[in-house]
Amino acid sequence: MRLVLATRNAAKLEELRRILAPIVPVEVLGLGDLPAYPEVPETGATFEENALIKAREAAARTGLPAVADDSGLAVDALNGMPGVLSARWSGHGATDERNLRLVLEQVEDVPDERRGAAFVCAAVLVTPAGVERVAQGTVTGTLLRAPRGSNGFGYDPIFRPAGETRTTAEMSAAEKDAISHRGKAFRSLAPLVASALA
């Protein structure tokens, strides 16, 4: 069985393949594996809406079951932002580095005890027959004042999960997968994928 994962993000694709591989025996294709796949605008107001937009489009275009996620960082001191704008927080041409620096600038004067944040993920499955399944995952933690670690991507170098002394960028891939928002969402989605594809 083949499944398309509606992302071009190589780091995310690898992370999601690692998480799904032991649970659901399917060949996972990314959008980069498909010819001339267009960009799909993420116009939703929530992570779930954006994930459904991407998965519905991928299922319709490929005729394959499609999985998509939308995830981001919700910072308490920024009223839950950058949220669904996490990947493009620093504007046109946003990069992980620019986004991370902007968040650090925006919370620079926030005291340590008020630097709470959460990584949030909505993961969805959409089949060509119209079956839709949704799973959510969240990991809470604290924003550091400076980046630490070189693993992971995005805001990982400034996010320390609750109960941890390390950032998610200081963890191995297996350690991060075990606690991450995406790991939680996709482990919850995996049995739904298995039953929908049975």
Regions found by a protein language model. Give the residues of each.
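Anionic-ligand binding patches
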Residues: 1-4, 10-198
